[in-house]
């Protein structure tokens, strides 16, 4: 019989939505020759910040 392991809920990621501009937005990013530019037109639903709607693309 294999030993039991315990998983703690506080380890790793917590469930929930994180603010996009606080976790993924990198304003000082410098483009590279291998980057691909893609443009999307996004209209957020009422009450949704534009950067959050853009993050969903």
Swiss-Prot record:
Keyword field: Acetylation, Calvin cycle, Carbon dioxide fixation, Chloroplast, Lyase, Methylation, Monooxygenase, Oxidoreductase, Photorespiration, Photosynthesis, Plastid
Residues of the propeptide: 1-2
Top EC class for this record: lyase
InterPro entries the UniProt entry points to: RuBisCO (IPR033966), RuBisCO_lsu_fd_N (IPR017443), RuBisCO_lsu_N_sf (IPR036422)
UniProt GO MF annotations: monooxygenase activity; ribulose-bisphosphate carboxylase activity
Reaction(s) the record says it catalyses: 2 (2R)-3-phosphoglycerate + 2 H(+) = D-ribulose 1,5-bisphosphate + CO2 + H2O; D-ribulose 1,5-bisphosphate + O2 = 2-phosphoglycolate + (2R)-3-phosphoglycerate + 2 H(+)
Chain's role: RuBisCO catalyzes two reactions: the carboxylation of D-ribulose 1,5-bisphosphate, the primary event in carbon dioxide fixation, as well as the oxidative fragmentation of the pentose substrate in the photorespiration process. Both reactions occur simultaneously and in competition at the same active site.
Subunit structure: Heterohexadecamer of 8 large chains and 8 small chains.
Further facts: The basic functional RuBisCO is composed of a large chain homodimer in a 'head-to-tail' conformation. In form I RuBisCO this homodimer is arranged in a barrel-like tetramer with the small subunits forming a tetrameric 'cap' on each end of the 'barrel'.
Protein name in UniProt: Ribulose bisphosphate carboxylase large chain
